């Protein structure tokens, strides 16, 4: 309050003119531009955060900080094959090679199981946590809209409810890019209430209604099939498949990780599918190459031991009278020129557990014949006459297998169109190291981008708080002013107390 022309203690007039305070209303002070900027930034951060979280789950699978995983198994396998080449015919050393190969297959299978666990965990989290929280958020915002309108009808601005709604809108913005629109609706003469609409525009420019005043949409995720599908039941009744049209946000980041395979499906992100495919390609190439290497050849270097149903040898010739031999590049099976009617008697080292022709990290196993000792690694894949007593010291096939582990090989996997896409050329050991390095680069890149986006988001949050939040400098100055006023008032009361004491106790004592 402010008094003008004198005070209550020293005035020559009875007329006092004072200026009081009239409160006409209380409202929030917010900058719509900063709110929109904040929600745009947090949506981008949500995408990167989901990517980084996915890579973090893959790191324990491929990041072999200690030499006791796949790379170590390849080294042990090479060593045991080298030893076998000097001990041709020694069953013990063949068993050692098989044991080291089994260790390698177990590691591949373990990695495959872990990848599947990551996929199932992320699918479950996406459906049970992300989608459930998002749907709950949409419902809560809609209910707050109704509560705020009811309060405004009674003349209450409902600022606390608006604070809750703004906080939920910020959280909603982390899931997908949203646009928030406010408008005033007249409910009586001079009486208005606030109407809130929330939409999101997809990458194709189509606008979808999430919240329309008291109505709200809901999301549904199908995680049982591949790829994972996301459907939106909009607030105004429409139904849309938004799996491929999310521009940013946690939903997009999680779907990217679950559905995308980088070069193998023509997308810009190496998700979980990419690492599943490259691991299976490594396993399939290993099995196919070693099965081919263990085939018996005749004196002309051609596959032999092609048998008919009755056990007789098939003699297949082309038009020039030359023998026809071939190896299927996909399965590693021997092909014959007898219209496919001949049986192949070969010595495969690997076979699939599910009977399929494609080897994967999940289905590869040691071939039954090698496992039960019916045959082993062929020391020589040449057709030779072997003396039953002295045997043979030929070992060129074992040496070829050692070289096979060390030579450069092209590794590829099929894309969505069935075309082979080469992703690496090098040795088996280096191929796995390349998978590890690729994951490390992706993980580091995601974390770096995440840190940058957090920094930008914090700057935007500070700018927004400078408008709608508490100004700490101003509050500090007010505290200093209060302290000074308090000190002055205390000094005035002390002086007044001393004066009264003097008047009461120090006067009227004359003549005592």
Task: State the predicted function of each range.
Residues 1-512:
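Structural signature of extracellular appendage/secretion-system components
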């Amino acid at each position: 309050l402010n008094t003008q022309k004198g005070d209550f203690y020293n005035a020559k007039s009875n007329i006092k003119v004072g200026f009081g305070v009239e409160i006409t209303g209380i409202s929030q002070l917010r900058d719509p531009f900063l709110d929109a900027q904040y929600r745009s930034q947090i949506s981008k951060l949500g995408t990167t955060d989901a990517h980084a979280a996915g890579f973090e789950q893959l790191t324990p699978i491929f990041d072999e900080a200690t030499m006791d995983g796949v790379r170590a198994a390849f080294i042990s396998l090479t060593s045991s094959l080298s030893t076998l080449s000097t001990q041709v015919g020694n069953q013990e050393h063949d068993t050692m090679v098989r044991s080291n190969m089994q260790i390698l297959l177990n590691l591949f299978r373990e990695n495959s199981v872990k990848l599947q666990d990551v996929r199932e965990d992320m699918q479950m989290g996406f459906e049970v946590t992300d989608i459930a929280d998002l749907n709950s958020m949409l419902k809560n915002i809609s209910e707050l809209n109704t509560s705020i309108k009811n309060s405004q009808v009674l003349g209450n601005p409902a600022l606390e409810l608006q604070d809750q709604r703004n906080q939920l809108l910020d959280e909603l913005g982390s899931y997908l890019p949203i646009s928030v629109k406010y408008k005033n609706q007249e409910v009586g003469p001079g009486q208005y209430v606030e109407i809130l609409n929330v939409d999101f525009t997809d990458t194709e420019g189509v606008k979808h209604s999430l919240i329309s005043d008291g109505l709200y949409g809901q999301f549904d995720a199908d995680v049982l099939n591949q790829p994972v599908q996301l459907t939106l039941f909009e607030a105004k009744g429409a139904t849309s498949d938004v799996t491929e049209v999310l521009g940013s946000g946690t939903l997009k980041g999680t779907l990217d990780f679950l559905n995308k395979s980088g070069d193998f499906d023509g997308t810009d992100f190496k998700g979980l599918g990419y690492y599943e495919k490259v691991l299976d390609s490594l396993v399939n190439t290993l099995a196919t190459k070693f099965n081919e290497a263990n085939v018996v050849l005749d004196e002309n270097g051609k596959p032999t031991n092609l048998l008919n149903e009755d056990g007789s040898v098939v003699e297949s010739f082309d038009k020039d009278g030359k023998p026809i031999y071939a190896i299927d590049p996909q399965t590693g099976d021997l092909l014959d020129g007898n219209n496919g009617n001949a049986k192949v008697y070969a010595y495969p080292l690997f076979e699939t557990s599910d009977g399929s022709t494609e080897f994967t990290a999940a289905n590869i196993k040691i071939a039954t014949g090698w496992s039960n000792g019916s045959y082993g690694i062929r020391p020589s894949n040449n057709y030779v006459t072997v003396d039953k007593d002295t045997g043979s010291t030929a070992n060129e096939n074992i040496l070829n297998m050692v070289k096979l582990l060390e030579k450069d090989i092209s590794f590829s996997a099929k894309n969505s169109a069935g075309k082979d896409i080469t992703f690496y050329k090098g040795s088996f050991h280096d191929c796995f190291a390349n998978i590890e390095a690729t994951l490390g680069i992706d993980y580091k890149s995601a974390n770096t981008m995440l840190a940058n986006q957090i920094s930008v988001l914090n700057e935007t949050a500070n700018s927004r708080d400078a408008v709608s939040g508490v100004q700490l400098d101003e509050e500090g100055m007010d505290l200093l002013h209060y302290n000074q006023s308090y000190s002055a008032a205390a000094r005035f009361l002390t002086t007044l107390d001393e004066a009264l004491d003097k008047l009461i106790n120090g006067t009227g004592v004359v003549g005592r």
